[in-house]
């Protein structure tokens, strides 16, 4: 069965608190933190971008997989903040991990679910025996306009997954997707910051797609919430994540391990891959995991996984997600604005 052979995560070490951003714009930090369920977010340094995040996560995934990178037949990097408009991030990753030249590679974009789309694509290639291993990465250095609500959550980070058939640490048993044309969030070529539909991004966008994908996956697998040990969903903020879990019938115990947004913000394409990596860091053999991503535009990908014995041998071969998150240094708004290129000369 196709499954995860190795995984790796990376989150930049810099952080900015919600109260620091609120101080600049005269907003109420207590109300914002309570409403969004976000306390602080990650900030990429001046020398960090989607490609560097993807490379680091990929190297950690290789460390856990313990395979020859030359056996990787496909690399897909999902992001909405690729450093180049014309120049793939995937080839940078491929060269950095010594996987070139005998492979296919491409950059993917579907708002915040491009990473899980890459997982589905590698699953198909591996399952059909077209390749032995595939590498799928979800990573972003997301942007929010100064003073916009997104500025309190848009952050940076990502995770990588090596997909294969042998020595899997978790089997991916089923996948299901739900997709419509819903323009809740978008950015045209040349624009520095995205536009969004405000409250419209909730019920007809995020919740409609996440809940529909989850229900479709329940039906496809003939399963229910209590059949799973862990569950995680896309998390533009903590509030949406917790509400989605409750609506679907999951308990707080099932979903708490995957909730990372309060301490790192919304890593966009990295959100669900990072949540899953944090679950794999603690899951035991036999545990079942339920995962649903979301990308504006709009669509959701769902997965069910079962953890295998190999997790015990592999998870300590690379830094754990929470350890990476705990390594942090706070910056003020001036440094944050400089790192994020918000100051235009």
Curated annotation (Swiss-Prot):
Give binding positions for CoA: 199, 239
An example of a Pfam family matching this protein is ACP_syn_III_C
UniProt cross-references to InterPro entries, sorted A to Z: ACP_syn_III_C, HMG_CoA_synth_N, HMG_CoA_Synthase, Thiolase-like
Give the protein's function: Catalyzes the condensation of acetyl-CoA with acetoacetyl-CoA to form 3-hydroxy-3-methylglutaryl-CoA (HMG-CoA). Functions in the mevalonate (MVA) pathway leading to isopentenyl diphosphate (IPP), a key precursor for the biosynthesis of isoprenoid compounds that are building blocks of archaeal membrane lipids.
Q: Which family does it belong to?
A: Belongs to the thiolase-like superfamily. Archaeal HMG-CoA synthase family.
Q: Which residues bind (3S)-3-hydroxy-3-methylglutaryl-CoA?
A: 28, 112, 153, 201, 234, 243, 266, 296
Sorted UniProt keywords: Acyltransferase, Isoprene biosynthesis, Transferase
Protein name (Swiss-Prot/TrEMBL): Hydroxymethylglutaryl-CoA synthase
**GO MF terms, alphabetically ordered:** acetyl-CoA C-acetyltransferase activity; hydroxymethylglutaryl-CoA synthase activity
The EC code for this enzyme is 2.3.3.10
- Give an example GO biological process: farnesyl diphosphate biosynthetic process, mevalonate pathway
Assembly behavior: Interacts with acetoacetyl-CoA thiolase that catalyzes the precedent step in the pathway and with a DUF35 protein. The acetoacetyl-CoA thiolase/HMG-CoA synthase complex channels the intermediate via a fused CoA-binding site, which allows for efficient coupling of the endergonic thiolase reaction with the exergonic HMGCS reaction.
């Amino acid at each position: 069965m196709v499954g995860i052979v190795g995984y790796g995560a990376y989150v930049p070490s810099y952080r900015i608190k919600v109260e620091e951003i609120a101080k600049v714009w005269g907003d109420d930090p207590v109300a914002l933190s309570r409403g969004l369920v976000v306390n602080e977010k990650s900030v990429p340094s001046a020398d960090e971008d989607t490609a560097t995040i993807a490379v680091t996560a990929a190297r950690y995934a290789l460390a856990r997989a313990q395979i020859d990178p030359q056996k990787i037949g496909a690399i897909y990097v999902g992001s909405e903040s690729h450093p180049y408009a014309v120049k793939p991030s995937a080839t940078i990753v491929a060269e950095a991990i010594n996987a070139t030249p005998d492979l296919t590679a491409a950059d993917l974009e579907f708002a915040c679910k491009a990473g899980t789309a890459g997982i589905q694509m590698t699953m198909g290639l591996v399952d059909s025996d077209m390749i032995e291993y595939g590498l799928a990465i979800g990573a972003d250095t997301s942007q929010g306009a100064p003073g916009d609500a997104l500025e309190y959550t848009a952050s940076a980070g990502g995770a990588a997954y090596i997909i294969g058939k042998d020595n899997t640490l978790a089997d991916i048993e089923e996948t299901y997707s739900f997709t419509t044309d819903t323009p809740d969030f978008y950015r045209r070529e040349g624009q520095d910051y995205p536009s969004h539909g405000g409250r419209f991004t909730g019920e007809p966008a995020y919740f409609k797609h996440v809940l529909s994908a989850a229900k479709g996956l329940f039906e496809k697998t003939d399963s229910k919430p209590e059949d799973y040990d862990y569950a995680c969903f896309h998390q533009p903020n903590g509030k949406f994540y917790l509400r989605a879990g409750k609506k679907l019938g999951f308990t707080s115990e099932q979903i708490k391990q995957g909730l990372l947004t309060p301490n790192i913000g919304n890593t966009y394409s990295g959100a669900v891959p990072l949540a899953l990596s944090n679950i794999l860091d603690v899951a035991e053999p036999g545990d079942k995991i339920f995962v649903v991503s979301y990308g504006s535009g709009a669509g959701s990908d769902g997965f069910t996984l079962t953890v295998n014995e190999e997790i015990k041998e592999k998870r300590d071969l690379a830094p754990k997600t929470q350890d990476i998150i705990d390594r942090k240094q706070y910056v003020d708004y001036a440094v944050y604005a400089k790192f994020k290129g918000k100051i235009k000369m």
